[in-house]
A protein has these predicted regions:
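Signature of N6-adenine DNA methyltransferases within the class I
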Residues: 1-9, 148-149, 170-177, 184, ...
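Intrinsically disordered, low-structural-confidence terminal and linker regions
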Residues: 2-31
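Class I S-adenosyl-L-methionine
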Residues: 23-24, 28-206, 226, 281, ...
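Short, solvent-exposed loop/turn segments at secondary-structure junctions
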Residues: 133, 194, 223, 243-244, ...
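Structural motif
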Residues: 164, 188, 236, 443-444
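Short, conserved active-site loop motifs that form the nucleotide-linked donor/cofactor pocket
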Residues: 215
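Polybasic, glycine- and aromatic-enriched phosphate-binding surface used to engage nucleic acids
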Residues: 265, 362-525, 550
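Short, amphipathic C-terminal "tail helix"
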Residues: 557-567
Length: 567
């Protein structure tokens, strides 16, 4: 059995004499191990059908019917209702005959008689999603695409009727059936899941029921198998690839699907991929972004909210083409649309798609122009990982214990009282920084999970859990409190959000923030103003904000833009 924890964690638990380490994960929200079945509400055409599908799932679980027979039986019923086979299962068209001969399965009468709704766009895909456990979907990355997203991505292609279209992760065939004005023999689908392939074949025959054709749906590993597909060149490749489901690999599998799909595009061919928003800015995907902007034309990036049951990741759709790179691409967020510069992507440290407006770019350019120093020469420390918060943290102080702060107690400039206490014994802790970092006479601490930097000052030598990290800054000409003033400034929050777009405040990003050269008088002034905020326990100073805006020559209109962005 594959271990559920990393080897490093295993070593730490062994060091700490933790027993039944694998079982620790059963008390946590470990989706990869979940056997819970979740009804994907966003996949329904009519939410009134949810109780019907819930009843069906209970029936299937009680009877313990095999998935393949369940789905085959439901598909047979749909073919009957569409008039493509009769009540004796005799096919009326050769594609239905081919499908029935391919799958030597016996229909289940109880499923043939079940009162399925007749107004669902993809009933078979919906049944499959309802039957699969949360853990299965999480491990494979297989969450089927809601119809409203399918329609939006498939719409507007405008290719010829005989354009070759491929979905390399076709699932139930939702994207392919969206091209109902195309020749179905020119629509190709691939999936590694044989049940998904069977569903897609049923769905293709049902959608194009007035045409007699054999669905071009195939079961193989698109990334590793060498088949006739590799010899074809497609006018459109459209898909929702698995996110993070590449077994035994460090990279997300969608990266591999993207790279191979671009190789299979015809000259001028289009590509439309649904991707996690991490594609836009996470450092590990820098190589992929660089590959795209240097070799292909980015047409549009559309931003969606999280919309898959069981998935909290926001996502985007990428529209690109096999053409020379252009200077800009279109950004679509809700009803708003605006052009964004490819140059800004190329100029960023990690080649991120910041989806910047021209106003965003102008502000970032002003900040970069004044950069004289950064935080790269500073000292950094991680918060403590106890390995067992439940037993090692205390809710009240007791002899020998001391306060330990979390990210929740960090406010701009100051800390609220600690709510947890710890007996500090480094040998019994899973992760610690050096003592001299925790016990430094002065240090800054910041929230690890946040959409913008939030820093506080500590001069008590306090301990911090790993929801907070530590910075002892070294910026020439600046006191630690002056640095704190810059880090909590609206301008720096804006720079971080637009330059990195991450919900984690990472050292690698913070080290790139642009600090200016200042006079000793400026340092004294800012140090005193920040000290006043700390002592009075205030989180905001208009004096500091305006001073830093003036320092970077940020206009009143740009200040308003920054403040609206941060709201």
């Amino acid at each position: 059995m594959t271990p559920l924890i990393s080897t490093a964690t295993q070593r730490n638990w062994k060091k700490l004499n933790v027993r039944s380490a694998e079982n620790k994960l059963t008390t946590r929200a470990n989706k990869r191990c979940s056997v819970k079945k979740i009804i994907p509400a966003e996949y329904f055409s009519d939410l009134k059908n949810i109780p019907v599908l819930e009843t069906f799932v209970r029936l299937a679980e009680q009877k313990k019917y095999p998935f393949n027979r369940i789905l085959f039986s439901a598909g047979i019923k749909q073919l009957q209702q569409a008039g493509l086979i009769d009540e004796t299962f005799f096919p009326c068209k050769k594609n239905a005959a081919s499908l029935l001969s391919e799958y030597d399965l016996k229909p289940i009468k109880e499923i043939l008689d079940f009162p399925f709704p007749d107004n669902e766009n993809d009933l078979l895909g919906l049944i499959y999603q309802c039957l699969r456990s949360e853990g299965e979907k999480n491990i494979t990355g297989a969450y089927y695409t809601p119809q409203k997203i399918v329609s939006r991505m498939a719409g507007g292609f405008g290719g010829a009727e005989n354009s070759l279209i491929l979905d390399p992760c076709c699932g139930s065939g939702a994207f392919l059936t969206g091209f109902d004005d195309h020749d179905p023999s020119c629509l190709f689908g691939v999936d590694i899941d044989p049940l998904a392939v069977m569903i897609a074949k049923f769905n293709m025959i049902l959608r194009f029921k007035n045409k007699d054709f054999i669905p071009q749906i195939f079961c193989f590993d698109f990334l590793n198998d060498s088949t006739f597909i590799n010899a074809l060149r497609f006018d459109l490749i459209i898909t929702n690839p698995p996110w993070g489901a590449a077994a035994g690999k460090d990279s997300d599998s969608f990266s591999d699907f993207l790279r191979k799909s671009f190789r299979l595009l015809s000259p001028g061919g289009r590509l439309k991929f649904l991707l996690p928003s991490a594609f836009l800015n996470v450092k590990s995907h820098r190589g992929l972004r660089e590959f795209l902007i240097n070799n292909y034309r980015i047409e549009k990036i559309t931003v969606y909210p999280a919309d898959f049951t069981g998935v909290v990741t926001p996502y985007v759709s990428l529209d690109a083409s096999n053409e020379p790179p252009a200077e800009s691409y279109l950004v679509q967020t809700g009803k708003a649309a605006y052009p964004s510069s490819v140059r800004a992507v190329k100029n960023s440290e990690n080649k991120i798609f910041g989806l910047l407006t021209r106003s965003d770019e102008q502000i970032l350019e002003k900040a970069a122009a004044l950069k004289a120093f950064d935080l790269s020469q500073s000292v950094w420390g991680l918060g403590i990982v106890t390995g067992d918060n439940k037993n090692k943290l205390r809710d009240a102080c007791e002899p020998g214990a001391e306060p330990i702060y979390t990210g929740k107690e960090i406010r701009p400039y100051f800390l609220t009282p600690a709510k947890k206490f710890l007996h500090y014994d480094r040998s019994q802790l899973q992760q610690t920084a050096k003592d001299e970092i925790y016990r430094a006479p002065e240090k800054l601490v910041y929230k690890f999970i946040s959409d913008r930097p939030v820093f506080a000052y500590d001069d008590t030598g306090a301990l911090f859990l790993n929801s907070a990290n530590i910075l002892i800054p070294n910026v020439p000409g600046m006191s630690i409190k002056t640095v704190l003033g810059f880090l909590n400034a609206e301008l720096f929050q804006f720079i971080y959000m637009k330059s990195f777009g991450d919900i984690k405040i990472l050292k690698s990003n913070l080290t790139l923030l642009p600090f200016p050269r200042i006079t000793p008088e400026t340092d004294v002034f800012l140090n005193a103003e920040v000290d006043r905020l700390i002592r009075s326990r205030q989180t905001y100073s208009k004096t500091i904000q305006d001073f830093i805006y003036d320092l970077y020559k940020i206009t009143s209109a740009q200040r308003q833009h920054i403040q609206e962005t941060l709201r």
